[in-house]
């Protein structure tokens, strides 16, 4: 039977619940247990698919096409389990489902209330998401005390009672600030945070004390005394120079032993040798490259969380320190390509909307004309095609219909029909809703032998995740190819362009899919690894 570890946060947000949860999950997995993770988001949006990257950060796409919270990216990078649409849900999704059942008459005329109807639906989804895992870690978004999270906290209170203390425990992350002028850590915020939890019937079993300084033994004893938590379960988690150290930090303090004993599980001791290798490669690089990343959302780098991590993973696999130079594409529009000078490679990620697109196109032109290694992702592929059409074909009005519906050469247009992951045909028009209407999830792609992308993957067919509603216009594709645009990857049915390359360029690859969603610190990703190798070759050539 599945054991549940519910994870909450207190005092302030952004303490790193997702990282801490994933790190514990990684240790339990290293002990031979089957582990899964869930993220419960209290906001009322149905999913984050239409939320601004400046507010929410990245939208992580699962294998089965769910648009989810970026924490699911952390989960997949730390454990081997593949997340699905069952691993993330929001208040909006819960209410949508309950109200649909009410409209159908499923509740037989009952008055619909938060308790029991909303809480029952939350519990049902937690159990479904946990599946047949030995241990399921369930992270509750937000901070204890927020009004939005109250139904979720009530639901886990009920579930703890229903499954019993041998199958459920609560891990609470809290801030233990260090006051430099006084030279001491303060435990009072933690005490009050636990008091808030206990007022709604939740007693923590584990406390993770986040701080920028070590939380000493006397402070941990004091916290244990005032919060009714075992002293061995009060864990100090200070800031580290790489998040991939955290499994080792938690293991060294015996957190996994406490969990295993509490649940009465029989399992092996943890083998964290893979994580030791990752940390060693990360902290002891043998080479160094600088890559210019030209994006639209540079004010909030969480909008590119998986991509930034994927570049770090590529550095790990190549024993190379990857310095990312973050450049706002609008700055290129205003200041020119001098911002790109000195970069060993150029990376243009995805995005939506007209703002900053011309700066991205200029960055592509700089990379192509100056033979600088280039990797384009999603919109990064579309702007590569637009740049080629304008500056090689001479179609100065070439554009995407996303940005100019009246373009005389719409080389990129809305996908109106495609087959989803199950083979069902989906259709869209300009009038379709924005939410949940993109080409989403894992799709097979046929790779052309002898291409740069084939050199990276070493396969004829690959599977990568997508999140887009625009594609290369097949009506203009023959002319583009005649002029030298190389199409090195197509969808399984051959209908959609997935990868393009530039002839007579040392390394120019642009893909419609999002390879960053499947990159992990232990295995890296072949495309990003190849990109960093190309950047190293460029640097050594200079």
UniProtKB/Swiss-Prot annotation:
GO biological process: 'de novo' CTP biosynthetic process; pyrimidine nucleobase biosynthetic process
Residues noted as binding UTP in the record, renumbered to the chain: 13, 186-191, 222
Annotated region described as Amidoligase domain, given as residue ranges: 1-265
GO molecular function, one term: ATP binding
Regulation: Allosterically activated by GTP, when glutamine is the substrate; GTP has no effect on the reaction when ammonia is the substrate. The allosteric effector GTP functions by stabilizing the protein conformation that binds the tetrahedral intermediate(s) formed during glutamine hydrolysis. Inhibited by the product CTP, via allosteric rather than competitive inhibition.
Record-linked Gene3D superfamilies: 3.40.50.880, P-loop containing nucleotide triphosphate hydrolases
List of residues binding ATP: 14-19, 71
SUPFAM superfamilies to which the protein is assigned, alphabetical: Class I glutamine amidotransferase-like, P-loop containing nucleoside triphosphate hydrolases
Catalysed reactions, semicolon-separated: UTP + L-glutamine + ATP + H2O = CTP + L-glutamate + ADP + phosphate + 2 H(+); L-glutamine + H2O = L-glutamate + NH4(+); UTP + NH4(+) + ATP = CTP + ADP + phosphate + 2 H(+)
Active site: residue positions: 378, 514, 516
Residues at which L-glutamine binds: 351, 379-382, 402, 469
InterPro entries: Class_I_gatase-like, CTP_synthase, CTP_synthase_N, GATASE, GATase1_CTP_Synthase, P-loop_NTPase
Pathway listed: Pyrimidine metabolism; CTP biosynthesis via de novo pathway; CTP from UDP: step 2/2
Keywords from the UniProt entry: ATP-binding, Glutamine amidotransferase, Ligase, Magnesium, Metal-binding, Nucleotide-binding, Pyrimidine biosynthesis
Function, as annotated: Catalyzes the ATP-dependent amination of UTP to CTP with either L-glutamine or ammonia as the source of nitrogen. Regulates intracellular CTP levels through interactions with the four ribonucleotide triphosphates.
Assembly mode: Homotetramer.
Family as reported in the entry's similarity comment: Belongs to the CTP synthase family.
Entry protein name: CTP synthase
């Amino acid at each position: 039977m599945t054991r549940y570890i519910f994870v909450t946060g207190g005092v302030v947000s952004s303490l790193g619940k997702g990282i801490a949860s994933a790190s514990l999950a990684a240790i339990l997995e290293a002990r031979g247990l089957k582990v899964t993770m869930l993220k419960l988001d209290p906001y009322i949006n149905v999913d984050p698919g239409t939320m601004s990257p400046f507010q929410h950060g990245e939208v992580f796409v699962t294998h089965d096409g769910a648009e989810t919270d970026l924490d699911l990216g952390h989960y997949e990078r730390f454990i081997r389990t593949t997340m699905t649409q069952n691993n993330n849900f929001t208040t909006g999704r819960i209410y949508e489902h309950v109200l649909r059942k009410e409209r159908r008459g499923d509740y037989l005329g009952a008055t619909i209330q938060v308790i029991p109807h909303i809480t029952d639906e939350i519990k049902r989804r937690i159990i479904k998401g946990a599946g047949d895992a030995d241990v399921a870690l369930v992270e509750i978004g937000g901070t204890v005390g927020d009004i939005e999270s109250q139904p979720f906290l009530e639901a886990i209170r009920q579930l703890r009672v229903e499954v019993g203390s041998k199958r459920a425990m609560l891990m609470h992350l809290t801030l233990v600030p260090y006051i430099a002028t006084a030279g001491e850590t303060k435990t009072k915020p933690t005490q009050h945070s636990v008091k808030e939890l206990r007022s709604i019937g939740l007693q923590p079993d584990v406390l993770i004390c986040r701080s920028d300084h070590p939380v000493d033994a006397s402070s941990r004893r004091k916290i244990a005394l005032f919060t009714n938590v075992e002293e061995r379960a009060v864990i100090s988690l200070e800031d580290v120079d790489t998040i991939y150290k955290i499994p080792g930090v938690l293991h060294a303090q015996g957190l996994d032993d406490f969990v295993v004993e509490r649940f009465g599980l029989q399992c092996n001791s943890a083998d964290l040798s893979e994580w030791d290798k990752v940390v060693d490669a990360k902290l002891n690089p043998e080479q160094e490259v600088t890559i210019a990343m030209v994006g639209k959302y540079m004010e909030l780098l969480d909008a590119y969380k998986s991509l930034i991590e994927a570049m770090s993973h590529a550095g790990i696999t190549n024993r190379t320190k990857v310095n990312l130079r973050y450049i706002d594409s609008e700055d290129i529009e205003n200041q020119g390509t001098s911002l790109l000078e000195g970069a060993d490679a150029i990376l243009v990620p995805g995005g939506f909307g007209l703002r900053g697109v011309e700066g991205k196109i200029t960055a592509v032109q700089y990379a192509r004309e100056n033979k600088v290694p280039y990797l384009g992702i999603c919109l990064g592929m579309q702007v590569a095609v637009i740049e080629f059409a304008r500056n090689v074909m001479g179609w100065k009005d070439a554009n995407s219909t996303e940005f100019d519906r009246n373009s005389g050469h719409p080389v990129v247009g809305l996908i109106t029909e495609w087959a989803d992951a199950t083979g069902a045909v989906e259709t869209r028009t300009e009038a379709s809703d924005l939410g949940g209407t993109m080409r989403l999830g894992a799709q097979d792609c046929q790779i052309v032998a002898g291409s740069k992308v084939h050199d990276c993957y070493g396969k004829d067919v690959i599977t990568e995740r997508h999140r887009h509603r625009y594609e290369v216009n097949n009506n203009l594709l023959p002319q583009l190819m005649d002029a030298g645009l190389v199409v090195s990857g197509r969808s399984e049915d051959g209908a959609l362009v997935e990868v393009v390359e530039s002839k007579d360029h040392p390394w120019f690859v642009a893909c419609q899919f999002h390879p960053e969603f499947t990159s992990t610190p232990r295995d890296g990703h072949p495309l990003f690894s190849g990109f960093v190798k190309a950047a190293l070759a460029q640097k050594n050539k200079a």
